[in-house]
């Protein structure tokens, strides 16, 4: 019973609690709904206020934009009106100018009409005068024909003949004067070019040498060089082809030979043997072979250095080595390599003055004597060998022709070939260039003066300009003007018959008459 009551009470309390909870939750929900509605109304009111503010702001901006556009439009309209006004003013000014020009043209047209009328009148007068002059000329021609018994055609032919003769003579005189002037100018220009080239090219004096000297540390070394029964010296002479001269010269051995390459090989080998101290046939063979290789390498270096100094590039390596061999070749005492470099410089300078290819000219000058490097090993003249080498190594045709023609064996086909021949003559013929040439030079001067002074009436003679000219002073009371010309011809013939000389020699006979009186 008691438990039932408590159960009922519990159920009742639970029911009451549920009802009370329902109403409490309902009141809370209604309160929240009312708060949310109030908040929504507040937010809506704020949004309306913001929208109204934005609307007002947009209206203000629109009004400002409209005001700005209106102001700009007014300014643009004002500018356009101003521009239109200026154009209108310019058009009015042009119209006024055209009106003035129209008036000026009308005035000029009137003036031209007046001048035309005047010209027509003068033309009529001229025609009348020409008619009268024609009649007078016809009358005069008729009268002249009657007086001279010649027709008009005959008189015309006579006059034309005289004019033609006079004109032909004048033309001949002018042509002769032009030829003389051209020759003088050409000679002058050639002398200027040659003198300029020679002044800009410095050359050394040379002397031929056929011996080399090897210094020894002491005279005892001479016996070691000779060896037992002379076997060392015989081996060295056999391998090098050079004669060793061991005499009383203190601490020196002389190497004699005409082949400079062999002589240089022997000198280097002997110098190495002396420094090494071991001198016997096997060691000599080793040193000679080593010296040959050193000389070959040095020859190649000399060839490369020469092409660099002269400014010639692109030569075949074999041709460079052959060029280096020229250092050990001489011609009448003149080193052929130095001579070739000198010719290259001179040819290049003259070619530059004439507007020719300076590099090609230097190349032709450098290679003009290339055949002399091996002319003692190959049959043929150095010109033929040089042409073969240049052709073999595909040198320029101008270079080949320059080699072939520099001694006059063939005709030169280019200006550069002529310049190479001239430079070769300049380098070889100058005093001091070649030892034999120096002796011949002095002998030629003496012979020139001897021939000149052998004639009667010659007072004194002078060989000048390195033997290129001889001036002869004659006695004026013995030799007259005609005799002076004859004397010059006779001396010229004797020089041609008795002397050998390059180029030509100018013979000048000077006859001077002086009248001197003294006032007391």
Swiss-Prot record:
Record-annotated membrane-spanning stretches: 4-24
Region Disordered: start-end pairs: 86-111
GO biological process: mRNA catabolic process
Domain HD: 336-429
UniProt-listed Enzyme Commission number(s): 3.1.-.-
CDD domains listed in its UniProt record: HDc (cd00077), KH-I_RNaseY (cd22431)
Domain KH: 210-273
SMART domains referenced in this protein's UniProt entry, alphabetically: HDc, KH
GO CC terms: plasma membrane
Stored InterPro entries: HD/PDEase_dom (IPR003607), HD_domain (IPR006674), HDIG_dom (IPR006675), KH_dom (IPR004087), KH_dom_type_1 (IPR004088), KH_dom_type_1_sf (IPR036612), Ribonuclease_Y (IPR017705), RNase_Y_N (IPR022711)
Domain of life of the source: Bacteria
Recorded family membership: Belongs to the RNase Y family.
Record protein name field: Ribonuclease Y
Organism annotation: Bacillus cereus (strain ATCC 14579 / DSM 31 / CCUG 7414 / JCM 2152 / NBRC 15305 / NCIMB 9373 / NCTC 2599 / NRRL B-3711)
The encoding gene: rny
